[in-house]
Amino acid sequence: MRQGGGGGERMVSVLFLLLIHLALCQAKCVMTECDGEEDSNHPPCKTNKSTYLPITVTRSLNPTYMARFEKYCSYLVQEEDKAQVCCTELQLKGMTDRISNAATILGSCPSCFDNFAKLWCQFTCSPDQSKFMKVMETTGPKNVVVKMEFKVNRDFVEGLYESCRHTWFANGLALRLMSLGGKVSFENFYGFMGTKNLAQSIPINTEFQFSRMKNAMNIPTTPCHKSAGPKVPACGAIDCPTNAHQLVDISKVEHLGTKVFHPHFPDFEWLLKICGCLALTVLLVFILKYSCHRRSAPNGEDGCYVDLGKGNLEVQFEGLCARYANAVIKHPLIFVSLGLIVAAACCSGNFKFHSLTHSVDQVSAADGETRRNEKKFIHSFGPNHRIEQIFINLPPTTKSMFNMPLFEEMFQLVGNIQNLTACYGNSSVKLDDICYKPIGKNHGCAIMSPTNYFQNKWTNFENAGPPTIDDEIFDDQHWEHLKYCIRNPLTVSTYSEMSCFGEFSGPIDPILVFGGSNESIKGAEMYYTARTIMITVLIRGPEDQAIAWETAFLNMMSRYEMKHANFTFMTETSVAEEIHTAVETDKIVSVIACAAVLIWVITMLGINHWPESSILSALVHHKLLISISAVMISVISVWCSIGMFSLFGVHATDNAIVVLFFVITCLGINRIFVIIRTFQANGHCYGLPNISYREMNHRISNVMRRSIPIVLTNSLICSTCLFLAGGVLPYVSVSMPAVEVFARHAGLAILMDTAFYLLVMLPLFQYDARREMSGKCEIWPWYELSNESKINLCMEAVDGNLRSPVDWFKLAIAPLLLKKICRIWIATFFFVSLIIACYCTLCLEFGFNQVMAFSETSYLTKHFQNMNENLNIGPPLWFVVEGDVKWHDPKMQNKFCTLAGCDDNSMGNKIRSLAYAENYKGNYLHGDVNIWLDSYLQFMHPRGSCCKMDGKQFCDPSNATHCSSCSSSSVASLTTTEYEFYRNLHHFLETPPSIQCAHGGMALAKPAINLTRNGKIQSAYFSTFFKKLNLSDSIQLYDAWRFAKYLADDIERELEIPGVKVYVYSTFFPYYEQYLTLSTTVYTLVVLVLFVAFVTISLFLRVNLAGSLVTVFVLLSSYLHLMEWMYLLGITVNVVSVINMAMSLGIAVEFFGQMLHGFYNSKKPKREERAFAALVSNGSTTLSGIFPAIMITAGCLSFADSRVLITYFCNQLVGIGLVCAVHGVVYMPTLLAIFGSDFYQNVSSEEESTDEAELQDTPPSTTSSTSSTSETSV
């Protein structure tokens, strides 16, 4: 009995002890609200009772508490109607407010946010606080907690960190805002949350203890790729890289490549068309040339099929020219009057002329794709900001940008800019009147500058200081705030209790402010080493007022000096103004060039004889009138071309006009040299004392008959070259209006110059020829050579004793052609050089350095170099969605957004993933991404603090404690009606971003949405940036455009929304669309010009088919050698050089046409002698006429300020002159001597036969001079 009873007593004792132990081990609360405090953000107090147990709350008694509690801590509700908690209602309110603020940062990833909320629910409200929490330090009589110890299982903290470390917020990692120093790491993340910071709503210090002991807090975490609860989606592809997400395949993007001819050779279809055109052309020429009615054969049979009259087509053409010459001789005043009337009528259009000043109008066709997109973008969203920039470069002697004198100067500079006043009409304009204010008119201007981290106030800079003595390790106390803002630009209050936001109430990304940093340093600390400080002022006021202010800004900055740094600057109008300034300087060069050419023409056009003692006798055979008239007519031709185009609203650039005078003067001079040299070479310029009027007419008519065909043929080919390049049918567009307009103006100017040659120069020539044959002085017509002097000159001409400035050519150069060994060496060298030229052509590269538009001494040249070296990011890029999109439909929203629940291949995910991708080959995106729909969805999120309603009244987020959420949905997409969607969208667009609501859409979303009149979204854009692009590398800029276009097309295809289009726009796109078809343009231009040359020469000159083919071959060779010249001088291929390349073919015809005409009109029996005769008569004309005119023009252009003129006109003109001269004077006669015909086809027109018959009736005294001097040149 006792034993049994004793055992029962022991059992009771054990149970009693167990109950006591359980009572002692029961969890308790370790902190609670402080007595008398009503501030929910006040630190808690330590519990006064060691037995402070959790409190029980029920739904029936505490409905408000339970509603707030379940918002973030629903997992702690053990039963449906009650929960055990350690937090009072005041503590709960403070915790939910702090978690709501975190929802703004972490809310895009529900799993991350859920884990984060669990951590602080456990910390604040867990009924098991005493198991894993311990008060380490208190203060005051109320035992206000200063420091807590929080034991957390490592599995939980690692799970929380891993679920959040890839979450993005405001175009950066969210944890960047929740990590010490802005450096995202496990330790910095928990170090930040454990460090007291009232500005960040962290009321106490917390020492996190990480362990895997059983007493450490440990509850399950949700990985980012899993759902945190029913109807809650997993994190999106951007926030959770563990999800399988494939970047857009960009391997199919078309790149320009560096080589012009290798990767972009035309396709087979293009070649087939060209071959077909070639075959048809040859057939047509053969029919017209060789199937016309010739003179009857001895048997009386005709040897052809098409009756075009007596003689070959070219002979008929010469006959027409002869009849025109006779008309000019008979009625010179009528033709001159007609020419003056035409000139006056055409020049009258100059009253409507104004030059192209807007750069985009010069480089991109108005109907091009990029221009159409630009017009749509500006029409939908308004013009882009005008940008004013200042780059401040630290001198080598300055070790760091953290320099007090430097910042003092910067504050002064920014202050001067803000206070700068410009005159505008009768009023004044200040920066505050026109600057961009993203948050509204009541806020400051958007100035991206380091000084704006201090709100551009020197007093704020002086008052900024470190909070503790430990921070004195910095160079100066003022730099702590700046460095903190560089690390965390979204910080609203630093240790100095100052905001990092600028005076425009927005953040300043250090990537836009600091340049020239040491890129080997990772993270935001890289910007501490910046050697360049960038100040950017954004303007979005009326254009006229903005231009007035920019003019004042330029005047101020051009005189401004800084003692402790160097700087460069530019404004939106700088490019146009600097180009205009350079053109004004180049106009002087143009005048000098025309004067130099005129002096050369006066010197070389006449013959230097001094037959009598009077100085006036030396001026008998000079050509002052012809020389001056030729230059003046070329100038008038340019003005006529400009006037005619101006009448139809087609205007050229100032640079184009300057170059036009050079080109047309050179070509016009050549025409005069052709007729004058023909006149001189046949001995017609010398007249006997008794020369008859009919003999004079015969000589003049004969010269005109022989020179007009070659002038017209050359003009036709040259103008055709330019018209083709200028987009005249057959259309060969180079997609650059300034160059196309230049080509059209030049083509028309050549035709006008030819017309004035026929209407004005020929009558003047016949007058001057009569004067010269009569032996009269040009400037004093009353002086006349004696009969003895006239006879002596004629006799000396017959004996070959008279010398002209080009006789050295006849004596030294031309005889080499008669030597077979010389011809072999020349031909061999020609073909070897042709092979080398082909190789160099294949190495020719695309490109255009836009800095070359300015002189080397221009302030813009230095600034562009500064931008290339120091910019950290490229231009902005906009992806525009236009069409009928049902934005209120959640399924449709998922096609565009990047939040949890959105499609992995949504538009936003594609853009954002590429913008954040690193080392992805071929990717051009980098930097911040603005997805307005994401901001709107987060603005509407029920857990957020943005969209709140009080009944039907929208609540200001800064005062919305009494309001309820606009949305009852717990997912990212909005399940609302269309009416509710647009009602809330209006509130969203009018809400500025703030501490209480970071997702307000006024700053970034409002400019991105284009609404119709009834408030529906008509179009909207998502924006990002390009990576850093080389502004001097046009190939890279072109490839960036093609990449963006490919991405937009891919997005549009993936959306599969009928009627919805996606296009891209960036400010530089219109400048590089030209390269899209440039390769094909080069091929097509060459082929078409060669066809035109072949047809024209074959039909209108006395040339057989072999001669035409030789000419075309030499033309092609000259083209290839010109590209070799370009390669050797580093001249890249672009629309400017392509126009010059097309023009070179036209100029080459001026060289080759004369040689060909001279060869096939020579009566020598052998082809070597005929080539010799052509070289003597026509080669000297070329080397004394157009060739020196080109070289003189190029020499004058070398003094121009514009490097575009120097590179693409001066250097290229030198190449054109040298290549054409060598081909026309060396290669052409050599090939004709080898492959040309051995006979002269003596077919005469009716006029030629009539002239010969008339000469037979002429007395011997008058014909002797003609017959004796007809071959003096050969």
UniProtKB/Swiss-Prot annotation:
Region (Disordered): 1245-1274
InterPro entries according to UniProt: HMGCR/SNAP/NPC1-like_SSD, NPC1_MLD, NPC1_N, SSD
Residue span(s) of domain SSD: 586-767
Topology with respect to the bilayer: Multi-pass membrane protein
PANTHER family attached to this UniProt entry: NPC INTRACELLULAR CHOLESTEROL TRANSPORTER 1
Disulfide bond entries: C29-C86, C34-C45, C73-C121, C87-C125, C109-C235, C112-C164, C224-C240, C435-C445, C485-C500, C897-C902, C946-C997, C947-C966, C955-C963
Localization in the cell: Membrane
Transmembrane segments: 268-288, 327-347, 588-608, 630-650, 656-676, 722-742, 745-765, 824-844, 1079-1101, 1106-1128, 1138-1160, 1172-1194, 1204-1226
UniProt-recorded name of the protein: NPC intracellular cholesterol transporter 1 homolog 2
Originating species: Caenorhabditis elegans
Pfam families named among the record's database cross-references: NPC1_MLD, NPC1_N, Sterol-sensing
Biological process, per Gene Ontology: cholesterol homeostasis; cholesterol transport; dauer larval development; intestinal cholesterol absorption; sterol transport; vulval development
Record field: compositional bias (Acidic residues): 1245-1255
Highest taxon in the source lineage: Eukaryota
Gene Ontology molecular function: any one: cholesterol binding
